[in-house]
Amino acid sequence: MKLILTQEVTGLGAPGDVVEVKDGYGRNYLVPRGLAMRWTRGGEKTVDSIKAARASRAVRDHDHAEQIKTKLEAQPVAVKVRAGAGGRLFGAVTVTEIAGALADASGEQVDKRTIVVTNPIKSLGAHEVSVKLHDEVSAVVALNVIPA
């Protein structure tokens, strides 16, 4: 099934990309959630308009992403969590908690889907997470997990 992506889909593409996916994935997941629309000959105009809008935002977004990166990397971010004896956490620190802590510390709203945690954070102390702000800009944020 040929689709036009209307939003970024991890591992598949960016808005405006024409992709070929299995029928069930397109029909049951991508299209109902508004992540893609069916490809038609008239849809080529939609692709062109999406790509033109994306190109015009690219330079502005890159500069803005650099500014946010500077803010995020300037200071460590503290996340308060419940912990047991020995510094072991009850569960793991989620990307939602990290996004909230980043918003509190820097004043910038960061989408939780852009936060990349390589290993689950299950202990107190210093950790690092990366935030993909733009195709070419990633920020490595120092995260300090402290007991609540």
Curated annotation (Swiss-Prot):
> Disulphide bridges in this chain?
none
Q: Name one GO cellular component term.
A: ribosome
Question: What keyword terms does UniProt attach to this protein?
Answer: Ribonucleoprotein, Ribosomal protein, RNA-binding, rRNA-binding
Q: A single GO BP annotation from the record?
A: translation
Molecular function GO terms recorded:
rRNA binding; structural constituent of ribosome
Q: Does the keyword Cell division apply?
A: no
Q: Which Pfam families match?
A: Ribosomal_L9_C, Ribosomal_L9_N
Going by the entry's taxonomy, the superkingdom of the source organism is recorded as Bacteria
UniProt cross-references to PANTHER family, sorted A to Z: 50S RIBOSOMAL PROTEIN L9
**NCBIfam families for this protein:** L9 (TIGR00158)
Task: Give the record's family classification.
Answer: Belongs to the bacterial ribosomal protein bL9 family.
Function description: Binds to the 23S rRNA.
HAMAP family for the chain: Ribosomal_bL9 (MF_00503)
The protein's name in its UniProt record: Large ribosomal subunit protein bL9
